[in-house]
């Protein structure tokens, strides 16, 4: 064996592919055995595999060959499709928790079914994650027909599904769900007050379809469940008006990060406008934050790119796919800044009740895998963040698609005229054309150009998403012209109509290079599926966003030189490739930075959610309450240390505080603590409060005490966790500005977040102990009621007496 072949085998990617290929060969060897079995016998074989895995300590990898061969035969009997060897290879890669890169049209959907079945033998649940509800429901319907033949159940989870139906969906062996609804269900599960109200039974194994779209593109925006907060309508409007009046020399926008900032002139203008001497003073932090948000909304964001306005609502558009991110809104007041800019209703800024990033969420699974047609360029990120090796799977048939060199134009206007001319030329031959645009504005601009040229066409973007499947399905027919805002995650193959292959197949025309080569490859991948003929070409201008943001200096000179000419240039292609790699590195660093910060909160969230589950599941809370009591008593007594002698306590003040806050009248007096050291006082206080709580349990009865105490503990934890999230987000936002010491902002954030977390735990303990101590027992309640009634009678007698005196 040569050195090169040896290195290929020891490389994780090649080693995994080599193993998967070997498995596929073995599966092929079982073909005749399963072909000769009846449907009933196939079901019996499936049940035997379940028993081996669940009762006899076999792993799914031990039975993978038999299971894949069995499900391959079942698929054939149900659909008439016999899984290709490359689909078996892909299924094995998915099964072991890695990323199978399979080109468009290579049968990723069936590959997922094969892998899902094998993992479902564990009976612990498989979550198949898709990018939208249409795909989830479509794929769940098709999978049900196959998997029910081998005794497996299939569920589908989507928004607005009744709670009991969600539980039923997640109780199935395989559950199809959208990524956003799955994440929100996880957050909502950790807000329930009864464990039996949870929807998701376990985060065991997830297969993410269009994995790069979900795990990278959407990972930049965290999932957030919000609650209403105060409405600062006037403040948003005032700041919006101020920002709209700013002159060009009063603000600046970094061309690469697109981060806005005020110049010195802008700062002086702001201080004069808002009547303050120092915009950066601590008391002005909220004002400064609102100004930066308004700058982002007014000077950076564009309607049709970052968001659209529909029916008076600001809806976020996925930068990469052109889809609306349903149920998502910008956080920390940015959404309100955009609403003020667009002069629509400004909703109250919400308080974050629960939040998680996709990176943190999907890493909670015992095993995570993914499939996509475009992942290889982000191999490093998938390995470092998700511990998945990206393994390219060869196409079933050779790829004969022709990828033409880019045509480069000096300005966008010249480019668009050339695009229309090219579309007209191709359309006259009857060959179908798919045109990819970078954003909604460009798709509508091209729509207007084609209308003027009398070229019939369809437009697929966030404004027309309801007809997505219908439009994509027809895009390969003779004469079809389809404009699409990015094709990432569209999920429906473009099949060539009769006679189209003879014309050269689908012609894909990109009108702008994206920030990521991966997104460009997704568009190219729509042509030439399963060995079909196809052709792709990009028309780009030096005024496109990618050049303007990341190569602006060199481009200014090139535009002057190029003028109105056009040419296919290896120089520009190389510069473009370098620019894309640079942007990919910047975006990776941004996501990595998000993960570094989120990791701190993720570990705290894990601790809180685990503790919350313990509260919900416990049949005896006494140990947990005692730990809280210990934390509470030390902190409570610490407030009353004698300033002259830290080992002594001001026993009079301590006694009064305990009687006032914990209702310890008749139990505690200053004499109890006379001449006691601090440690002895803590021990005595702990004993007295513990005794009071024990007596409450006896009077209430243990079952009732369990219910009442649990509710107090859950409510206190939720209240202070929400408060903690708000504090952490404010800390994160300002930590860079506040970091004046010789240490990184991340280290400052880690240290101060830990302080906030410990403070939160103390607040939870304090609330729980005080509320339990003040919880009225039936006797105390009756006694208080008698006192209240006596006071009412006394008051009535006084009023009657006063009236009789007035009458005399």
UniProtKB/Swiss-Prot annotation:
UniProt entry keywords in alphabetical sequence: ATP-binding, Cell membrane, Cytoplasm, Membrane, Nucleotide-binding, Protein transport, Translocase, Translocation, Transport
GO biological process per UniProt: intracellular protein transmembrane transport; protein import; protein targeting; protein transport by the Sec complex
Cross-referenced Gene3D superfamilies: Helical scaffold and wing domains of SecA, P-loop containing nucleotide triphosphate hydrolases, SecA, preprotein cross-linking domain
Catalyzed reactions per annotation: ATP + H2O + cellular proteinSide 1 = ADP + phosphate + cellular proteinSide 2
One Pfam family recorded for the sequence: P-loop_SecA
UniProt membrane topology term: Peripheral membrane protein
Its EC number(s): 7.4.2.8
Subcellular location: Cell membrane; Cytoplasm
Family: Belongs to the SecA family.
Gene name of the record: secA
CDD domains xrefs: DEXDc_SecA, SF2_C_secA
Subunit-structure text: Monomer and homodimer. Part of the essential Sec protein translocation apparatus which comprises SecA, SecYEG and auxiliary proteins SecDF. Other proteins may also be involved.
Protein name per its UniProtKB record: Protein translocase subunit SecA
GO MF annotation list: ATP binding; protein-exporting ATPase activity
Protein role: Part of the Sec protein translocase complex. Interacts with the SecYEG preprotein conducting channel. Has a central role in coupling the hydrolysis of ATP to the transfer of proteins into and across the cell membrane, serving as an ATP-driven molecular motor driving the stepwise translocation of polypeptide chains across the membrane.
GO terms for cellular component: cell envelope Sec protein transport complex; cytosol; plasma membrane
Chain positions recorded as ATP binding sites: 87, 105-109, 493
Family annotation (PROSITE patterns): SECA, SECA_MOTOR_DEAD
Predominant location: membrane
InterPro entries, per database record: Helicase_ATP-bd (IPR014001), Helicase_C-like (IPR001650), P-loop_NTPase (IPR027417), SecA (IPR000185), SecA_CS (IPR020937), SecA_DEAD (IPR011115), SecA_motor_DEAD (IPR014018), SecA_preprotein_X-link_dom (IPR011130)
